[in-house]
């Protein structure tokens, strides 16, 4: 008996990603997404069947609306690296002569996206000889932050209307009115980045049922930045901090942490960990034949702090925010079940150099409007010069500095960006000017740290390539 082999259409999911028209008669689907991304964080072919075009809706007044969904607009090979094979939804609409084309999008934030979206829409508008209305979702969903920033582009590719990013806003655009250049606020990537992180924390907490958050304050720059973001997202009265000094914590770090909390209006509780360190030493000594030392002793300090943070967050029903950065996650300069403990890694997609840049901006006059918008102190220091200027240190042993174990962050981060985001390897890295010994060392560290990243808290994606669902590498790779 002959049995027909299943085709690709048979295997395709039955769902479509669609636009629905809602009116007095009810609702009906009027357009289906054609280009289904399956790269980075996107896996739409697993869930959806691609639609066919062109997608055109004629209104009762005779106006013809072209309809596209997110990736259907991303068909310019010159502007992006990830170009999907398949139909050209914009090209399909050209002979239909639409009056306006609308693109409904759920496009997650990264630092390069806002400008890229406008360039893609401008290219489409010039091809179609009609305005393009780009409408982007606003809000955080797990690791993704949808930053909004909707706009209208004229048939000649010029902006007609722009909405701010990372906030809900409704605006009316009259397609028959005389076009006017919109009021454009200065483009500030650090402003956009900070607002995206605040939105990500706010929505993650709200959607997970948390009203309050907790973090550990060390007096270092990473925890300081997370404290500022959390305060902006949730309010100072909803954020608590623990100071957990060890014998190796400097007086300056403790003072800096207390001063930061005072500037932000945060509650602080100090829990010295020396008694717990002594207890672990006494308990482990019979098994080890000596007190823990070296990296084991350093990791115990981090795990003691992680346990205290988890206990308080558990008891108080708080969201624990972990404070590690992308540079540390990349090379494994973090402690599993210690400083990695938490429900959300707020700056886990920020390289250390980006942390410094964002903190410098927060303490500059350029951040004043943003500080006012989030009810942060509108004058004076936020992070503080003492925190921004001190050499980074985990303070897990006497006189420890990050530079004892890691290369200079400017060299390390430049190499990590080429490895992770630009996907360069071997001769390409050497041609880019990276030190051969550093390349070999960092490549090995990046591979070996995968087991830690697999168990890390979810992080907020704010770069083109983040660790998380879009980063899929084996743990055991030889």
Question: Model-predicted segments: where are they?
Answer:
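Enzyme catalytic cores with a strong preference for nitrogen-chemistry domains
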Residues: 1-216, 232-233, 268
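ATP/NTP-dependent adenylation/nucleotidyl-transfer catalytic domains that generate, transfer
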Residues: 129, 155, 181-218, 223-478
